[in-house]
């Protein structure tokens, strides 16, 4: 601990990594993650609703152009996997891409700005980037896998069809006895596959944004006059990371949904 009440570099980093939490253990709630996730989700819905309400058939404005570009890009991506437009898959992909993009953009706000303002009103900890909280990224990836299971249930007309679909791949047999014998191995591999999807989706998003936030914090330790060049360069590079991670999460979700359709 530094003398005079000053925090060491390690203590500053630790302070920025702590969420505003209520409760303990499994029942702990990260209030800052919940608040900013809901706020950004509502902002995304309001923004697209406003653009749609003001949409014109003539010459579109800048906001309408951007919204149409995003919509057409996602619709064409879905068509590439499914061969046709799918409003259900397209809506899911659009929601995930925009929501995660809004999450990630928060990482471009100066790292000390909002936490310092929150400290003035008695809030000791505040993390404003939901993507840097593994609880948020795991919740999102678990939701995606649960949606794929719901589609598996629907496409196979019930529980028995769902179990048959999950228990007949990747090892196949034409005979009934062979299918029964291979069912436990196939089903176990499907469970492992779904768990791997959850871990890979969540840790990829969390790891990239968490590392980016750490770099921003480390840059603030430099003398004030020397922060501009590395900070600006990293911010420009991070814009690519912010967009790319939202795209990767979206495209993998579409891939998983297309795999369900094919089976």
Curated annotation (Swiss-Prot):
<keyword id="KW-1003">Cell membrane</keyword>
<dbReference type="GO" id="GO:0042777">
    <property type="term" value="P:proton motive force-driven plasma membrane ATP synthesis"/>
</dbReference>
<feature type="transmembrane region" description="Helical">
    <location>
        <begin position="205"/>
        <end position="225"/>
    </location>
</feature>
<keyword id="KW-0997">Cell inner membrane</keyword>
<keyword id="KW-0472">Membrane</keyword>
<comment type="subunit">
    <text>F-type ATPases have 2 components, CF(1) - the catalytic core - and CF(0) - the membrane proton channel. CF(1) has five subunits: alpha(3), beta(3), gamma(1), delta(1), epsilon(1). CF(0) has three main subunits: a(1), b(2) and c(9-12). The alpha and beta chains form an alternating ring which encloses part of the gamma chain. CF(1) is attached to CF(0) by a central stalk formed by the gamma and epsilon chains, while a peripheral stalk is formed by the delta and b chains.</text>
</comment>
<feature type="transmembrane region" description="Helical">
    <location>
        <begin position="235"/>
        <end position="255"/>
    </location>
</feature>
<feature type="transmembrane region" description="Helical">
    <location>
        <begin position="31"/>
        <end position="51"/>
    </location>
</feature>
<feature type="transmembrane region" description="Helical">
    <location>
        <begin position="89"/>
        <end position="109"/>
    </location>
</feature>
<dbReference type="GO" id="GO:0005886">
    <property type="term" value="C:plasma membrane"/>
</dbReference>
<dbReference type="InterPro" id="IPR035908">
    <property type="entry name" value="F0_ATP_A_sf"/>
</dbReference>
<dbReference type="GO" id="GO:0045259">
    <property type="term" value="C:proton-transporting ATP synthase complex"/>
</dbReference>
<keyword id="KW-0812">Transmembrane</keyword>
<dbReference type="InterPro" id="IPR045082">
    <property type="entry name" value="ATP_syn_F0_a_bact/chloroplast"/>
</dbReference>
<keyword id="KW-0813">Transport</keyword>
<feature type="transmembrane region" description="Helical">
    <location>
        <begin position="133"/>
        <end position="153"/>
    </location>
</feature>
<protein>
    <recommendedName>
        <fullName>ATP synthase subunit a</fullName>
    </recommendedName>
</protein>
<comment type="function">
    <text>Key component of the proton channel; it plays a direct role in the translocation of protons across the membrane.</text>
</comment>
<keyword id="KW-1133">Transmembrane helix</keyword>
<keyword id="KW-0375">Hydrogen ion transport</keyword>
<keyword id="KW-0406">Ion transport</keyword>
<keyword id="KW-0066">ATP synthesis</keyword>
<dbReference type="InterPro" id="IPR000568">
    <property type="entry name" value="ATP_synth_F0_asu"/>
</dbReference>
<dbReference type="Pfam" id="PF00119">
    <property type="entry name" value="ATP-synt_A"/>
</dbReference>
<dbReference type="GO" id="GO:0046933">
    <property type="term" value="F:proton-transporting ATP synthase activity, rotational mechanism"/>
</dbReference>
<comment type="similarity">
    <text>Belongs to the ATPase A chain family.</text>
</comment>
<dbReference type="InterPro" id="IPR023011">
    <property type="entry name" value="ATP_synth_F0_asu_AS"/>
</dbReference>
<keyword id="KW-0138">CF(0)</keyword>
């Amino acid at each position: 601990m530094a003398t005079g009440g000053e925090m060491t570099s390690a203590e500053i980093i630790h302070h920025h990594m702590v969420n505003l939490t209520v409760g303990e253990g499994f029942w702990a709630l990260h209030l800052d993650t919940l608040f900013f996730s809901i706020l950004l989700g509502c902002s995304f819905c309001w923004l697209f609703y406003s653009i749609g309400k003001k949409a014109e058939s003539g010459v579109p404005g800048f906001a309408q152009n951007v919204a149409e570009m995003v919509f057409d890009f996602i619709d064409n991506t879905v068509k590439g996997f499914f061969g046709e437009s799918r409003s259900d898959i397209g809506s899911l992909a659009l929601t995930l891409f925009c929501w995660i993009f809004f999450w990630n953009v928060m990482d471009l706000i100066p790292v000390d700005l909002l936490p310092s303002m929150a400290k003035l009103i008695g809030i000791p900890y505040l993390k404003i980037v939901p993507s840097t909280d593994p609880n948020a990224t795991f919740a999102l990836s678990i939701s995606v896998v649960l949606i794929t299971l719901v589609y598996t249930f629907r496409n196979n007309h019930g529980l028995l069809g769902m179990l048959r679909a999950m228990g007949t791949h990747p090892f196949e047999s034409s005979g009934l006895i062979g299918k029964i014998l291979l069912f436990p191995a196939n089903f176990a591999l499907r469970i492992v596959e779904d768990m791997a999807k959850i871990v890979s989706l969540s840790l990829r998003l969390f790891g990239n944004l968490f590392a980016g936030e750490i770099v921003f914090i480390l840059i603030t330790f430099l003398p004030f006059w020397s922060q501009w060049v590395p900070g600006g360069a990293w911010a420009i590079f991070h814009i690519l990371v912010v967009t790319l991670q939202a795209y990767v999460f979206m495209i993998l979700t579409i891939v998983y949904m297309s795999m369900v359709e094919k089976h």
